[in-house]
Amino acid sequence: MGQKVHPNGMRLGIIKHWNSVWFSNSKDFAKILDSDYQVRLFLRKELFKASVSRIVIERPSKSIRVTIYSARPGIVIGKKGEDVEKLRLSITNITGVPTQINIAEIRKPELDAKLVADNIVSQLERRIMFRRAMKRAVQNAMRQGAKGIKVEISGRLGGTEIARREWYREGRVPLHTLRADIEYNVSEAHTTYGVIGVKVWIFKGEILGGIGSIPKIEKQKPMSQLKKHQRRYRK
């Protein structure tokens, strides 16, 4: 039976960068890897309402730099930067090394697979019909300029006794083309009928210059601009 390869893993080093950027000897590798996992687990839990898509971890000499990609940076920063300072101290306690936190804003959350999947999950948990949630996500992505999108939902849809799988696609989603910029992510909705899985593929276009033409880390927004978002989301 044929299986699909992971779209992100297949493109690593070709048109996609890693989410953990560091080198280690074999003795410390497992310890650092577990530290990365604990940091991501902590941030996902603390920033559950901040629409966090990616967490990139870099490890310069005896320190750690965490870049948080969020559609709502004001929630991450908090009042006068208090929340981000608490996050920095907590990560320092987890890793045992000095921590620097950068925040990158996601300008078009409709084109981010993780945020689209999380949005569908929140609708399913609010008992909105799954077909309506799928079509709304597809329409929003295509309106924002996506070349193609596919959404797949599996589980006890509508509370039926037998689990099934349904999907909806619009445009092109070329999974086998390595230069195709495919955003892929998954999320889970916990409903009264059980867990419903959501998968999202978004095709943004083709990258012809390879990985060298893509910035490894997006530039952090100036703090003055981030404070504007902070005031807006606090309202």
Swiss-Prot record:
GO terms for molecular function: mRNA binding; rRNA binding; structural constituent of ribosome. Residues 39-107 form the KH type-2 domain. One of its GO terms (biological process) is translation. The keyword Zinc-finger does not apply. One of its GO terms (cellular component) is cytosolic small ribosomal subunit. The keyword Transcription regulation does not apply. InterPro entries: KH_dom, KH_dom-like_a/b, KH_dom_type_2, KH_sf_prok-type, Ribosomal_S3_C_sf, Ribosomal_uS3_bac-typ, Ribosomal_uS3_C, Ribosomal_uS3_CS. It comes from the Bacteria. Keywords: Ribonucleoprotein, Ribosomal protein, RNA-binding, rRNA-binding. Coiled coil: none annotated. Part of the 30S ribosomal subunit. Forms a tight complex with proteins S10 and S14. Binds the lower part of the 30S subunit head. Binds mRNA in the 70S ribosome, positioning it for translation. Belongs to the universal ribosomal protein uS3 family. This is Small ribosomal subunit protein uS3. The gene is rpsC.
